[in-house]
Amino acid sequence: MKKIFVFLAISLISLKLFAQVSQVRVGLLNGPTCVPAAYLMENKKSISADGTDAELTYEKFADPQALLPKMIKKEIDIGFMPANVAAKVYNAGNKSIICCAVVGLGNLSLITTDENIRRFTDLKGKTVYVAGQGATPEYMFRYLLKENKMTWSGEKADITMDFSIPTAQIAAQLISGKIQYAVVPEPFATIAKTKSDKVITALDFQKEYLELTGEKEVYPLSVMVVRADFAKDNPKLMEALLADYDAAVNWTNNNAAEAGALCEKHSLGLAAGVVTKAIPVSNYTFVPAASAKKSIEKLLKLFLEGDKTSIGGKLPDKGFYYK
């Protein structure tokens, strides 16, 4: 009888190990965040860990709000989203989703057709259309305005922030002359400037941030996340996957034209030409979460100052950062 129990125990352990590495389900965001993933979609159908191959599957989502329910229901293992969204989910729930790497640094700018804008104070009395209410563009803009002693709320506000135009439509509205000032991430600044030589980058948020903070590297914009239980059960698989994504980022940064073509081929929501032109200024990177903790927390503190609910009321604890 004892031998039977031992045999069953070994069998169950073997089945569990097999299940752990049979498939890795990756959730991608359409648009600029996951451009480096196009390389993996083209070249990585599986991933090896401890001599066993796990199939890589990819599912695309319009935004983090569409992706998150599937991660929470354990239908997706790996995902991508803004750092504040990941922190909010971690703080609000049972810490089921953690950050494993920063994959994109800041690439925000104020674009305009007004050549007279040279500094933030030149925006006084203007209406600025901002991409992404409650996201990094809004809170980074708030921070930079505050540091330049500018206000954006109240009856005597120096500027008006408007969030009424979807991000993908801002470039067209600017080119048509319906609006004149906008805060956008890449590749939307590149799209606008490519289609009209009247559109210029007036304010580089990264440059301003570095000058104000004394930091050596700009703020994180997007992160890769993983289900905490998946990461715990599959450390070797995670190690291999993170190494592969790191390589994909390096390849993308060094092969802009080819990366643009792959992005269009795999229907990630952007035309090849746009991606190719935007990659040099998109700040794709790969920084393991443990190494990026300081920069992530610095960014999240800006969210806390602006709206505590934007990250779940507090900075996430050390368990948020995958090691």
Identify the residue ranges that each predicted region occupies.
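Sec/Tat signal peptide C-region and signal peptidase I cleavage site
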Residues: 15-19
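Secondary-structure end/capping motifs
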Residues: 231-306
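Pocket-lining segment of extracytoplasmic ligand-binding domains
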Residues: 83-85, 166-262
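Sec-dependent N-terminal signal peptides
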Residues: 4-13
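Conserved C-terminal helix/tail region of periplasmic/extracytoplasmic solute-binding proteins
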Residues: 297-323
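Short, solvent-exposed loop/beta-turn-alpha elements that line the ligand-binding surface or hinge
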Residues: 45-53, 208-214, 284-293
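Short, glycine-/small- and polar/acidic-enriched structural segments
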Residues: 22-162, 180, 186, 202
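Soluble non-cytosolic domains of exported or imported proteins
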Residues: 31, 61-65, 80, 131-139, ...
